[in-house]
């Protein structure tokens, strides 16, 4: 049976809608009273796993799900062995460097060498600062990274920014973008190679709704 890993949270409803448009109805998974983490599609020929956004590439890479939907930010950070099939176009946000609005820094290159930068996305942040040839001390936080500059644990943060409201409400300002992130359809490479047509048909059905990365 085809298994699809769907992300909890902000990407879920749009993910379910995209699969529904392609012929797989997983809408029961979004019901307010649903507590099941694995549900069959309405037609019974597929099932969905409801997992955390960061776990989607893990289930797909290890073959427990043949397809999945996940933000590009997670893909870039984890570098799992999965196939990027489609840019689904929703869930748009940007990975950005942010500092206190009162600070003198207005570009990432303005930051002093060996300063502290807090982030959930330390691999992406390290790659970015390496490209700038700017040595920094990265501090891995798992939530509320905005507190970094506020408390003084870091001079800057690297985090996802959608509307920018959270930054503004906490006296921070984004000074440089690393990359833009949207939801991506990913697949297990082995499952795609062994596909007898079912996966390809589903991807093609979704292709008109997205953009090939």
UniProtKB/Swiss-Prot annotation:
Q: What is known of its domains?
A: Lacks the C-terminal regulatory region which is replaced by HisZ.
Documented EC number(s): 2.4.2.17
Q: Which InterPro entries does the record match to this protein? A: ATP_PRibTrfase_cat, ATP_PRibTrfase_CS, ATP_PRibTrfase_HisG, ATP_PRibTrfase_HisG_short
Name recorded for this polypeptide: ATP phosphoribosyltransferase
A Gene Ontology molecular function term of the record: ATP phosphoribosyltransferase activity
| Membership in a protein family | Belongs to the ATP phosphoribosyltransferase family. Short subfamily.
Entry's SUPFAM superfamilies? Periplasmic binding protein-like II
Q: Which reaction does it catalyse?
A: 1-(5-phospho-beta-D-ribosyl)-ATP + diphosphate = 5-phospho-alpha-D-ribose 1-diphosphate + ATP
Task: Could you list this entry's UniProt keywords, alphabetically sorted.
Answer: Amino-acid biosynthesis, ATP-binding, Cytoplasm, Glycosyltransferase, Histidine biosynthesis, Nucleotide-binding, Transferase
Q: In which pathway does it act?
A: Amino-acid biosynthesis; L-histidine biosynthesis; L-histidine from 5-phospho-alpha-D-ribose 1-diphosphate: step 1/9
Give the originating organism: Synechococcus sp. (strain RCC307)
Q: Where in the cell is it found?
A: Cytoplasm
């Amino acid at each position: 049976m085809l298994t699809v890993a769907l992300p909890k949270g902000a990407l879920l409803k749009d993910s379910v809608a995209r699969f529904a448009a392609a012929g797989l109805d997983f809408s029961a998974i979004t019901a307010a009273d649903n507590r099941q983490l694995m549900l069959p599609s309405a037609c019974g020929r597929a099932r969905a796993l409801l997992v955390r956004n960061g776990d989607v590439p893990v289930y797909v890479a290890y073959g427990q799900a043949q397809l999945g939907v996940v933000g590009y930010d997670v893909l870039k950070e984890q570098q799992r062995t999965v196939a990027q099939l489609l840019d689904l176009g929703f869930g748009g946000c940007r990975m950005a460097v942010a500092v206190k609005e009162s600070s003198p820094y207005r570009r990432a290159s303005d930051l002093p060498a060996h300063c502290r930068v807090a982030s959930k996305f330390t691999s992406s942040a390290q790659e970015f600062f390496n490209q700038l040839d700017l040595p920094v001390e990265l501090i891995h936080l798992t939530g509320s990274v905005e507190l970094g500059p506020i408390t003084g644990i870091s001079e800057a943060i690297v985090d996802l920014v959608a509307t920018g409201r959270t930054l503004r409400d906490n006296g921070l300002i984004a000074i440089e973008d690393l990359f833009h992130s949207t939801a991506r359809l990913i697949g297990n490479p082995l499952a795609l190679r062994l596909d007898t047509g079912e996966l390809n048909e589903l991807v093609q059905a979704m292709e008109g709704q997205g953009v090939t990365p």
